[in-house]
Amino acid sequence: MNSRVFNFGAGPAMLPEEILKEAQEEFLNWRNTGMSILEIGHRTPEIISLLSTAEQSLRELLNIPKNYHVLFLGGAARAQFAMIPMNLLRPGDDAAYFITGIWSKMAYHEANLLKKAYYLSSEEKEGFVSIPDYQKWELKSNTAYVYYTPNETINGVRFPYVPKTEGVPLVADMTSCLLSEPINIRQYGLIFAGAQKNIANAGLTVVIIHEELLQNQPEPVIPTMLNYKNHADHRSLYATPPVFNCYLASKMFEWIKKQGGIEELFQRNCLKAAKLYQYLDSTDFYLTPVSKEARSIMNVCFSLYYPDLEQKFLDMANERGLKALKGHRFTGGLRASLYNAMPMAGVDALIEFMSEFAKENG
């Protein structure tokens, strides 16, 4: 197959074709340096300028106040499951967690392994198909932060609200939703996101952290590479950053601006998800486990009424250029991820195929 396909993968995800073409054109000789972006030293003026431009673009998109630091860190977002408690919990502190899916469950267990954590609510017994009703939760007096995952990539559930924390810093794993919908940064103490959904290619984690959370040095002492303050003090240059990822992220930030900004993309994302859910709700051939009020806009999880047809569905979808629809290995089933770069044409093509498949196999 020579043409581009529709990649519904949860990550690495689809990137805008125009960005890929720009990167291709610049690959051998970036900004007339005679070198590829992959070859340029990270402390050169060119790369320092690139990081500064990327940070400023992200600040403009999200209206990030000056008292928040933006960090571009190498590695998987999953590393934050350990870095957050190691940096934010001091002796005698507790952390509170909402367990609403696989990723928040993993984060909770990692925090408990290293420090002390408790959960405010767990939806595991119900199968991670809903979000706890909004209420005033009782926080322990020694709670240093409250952690939640606004969008659970694996389970396809989304918080329809921002939890109230009574002044306790709110920490959010926004790996699969950052830049897909408007947020108020001031409601959070720390936000992190892996890049491979809506930001860039895999290997970069963006952290946005309030300066007050950097004031107290961790106790006991932690490795220097895991200390947020070290990265903030060195403007993401404490060690070699993932330069190519930051380069793509900078292009992605500018692409979002050209599309009309985050609000415009949010409207598109809502329309894409609504169209797919509307089709799923119209047929008994496909099943959607998540309660309607908790459905993700980014990750639409579903299954077949006849599960033995799943592999046939995936094989035929692949032949139609509809890729990566297999659900996560922890949950099974099917999943269509509708990140910013997925056009409505991709959703239309998927619905057309699903309708034909249901008629032929129902």
Curated annotation (Swiss-Prot):
Keyword Transferase part of the UniProt annotation: yes
Q: Which cofactor does it need?
A: pyridoxal 5'-phosphate
Q: Name one GO biological process term.
A: L-serine biosynthetic process
Record InterPro entries: Aminotrans_V_dom, Aminotrans_V_PyrdxlP_BS, Pser_aminoTfrase, PyrdxlP-dep_Trfase, PyrdxlP-dep_Trfase_major, PyrdxlP-dep_Trfase_small
A GO MF term: pyridoxal phosphate binding
Q: What reaction does this catalyse? A: O-phospho-L-serine + 2-oxoglutarate = 3-phosphooxypyruvate + L-glutamate; 4-(phosphooxy)-L-threonine + 2-oxoglutarate = (R)-3-hydroxy-2-oxo-4-phosphooxybutanoate + L-glutamate
In terms of superkingdom, the source organism counts as Bacteria
**Record keywords:** Amino-acid biosynthesis, Aminotransferase, Cytoplasm, Pyridoxal phosphate, Pyridoxine biosynthesis, Serine biosynthesis, Transferase
HAMAP family per record: SerC_aminotrans_5 (MF_00160)
Q: How does it assemble?
A: Homodimer.
Q: Which protein is depicted?
A: Phosphoserine aminotransferase
Please give the organism: Legionella pneumophila subsp. pneumophila (strain Philadelphia 1 / ATCC 33152 / DSM 7513)
Gene (name only): serC
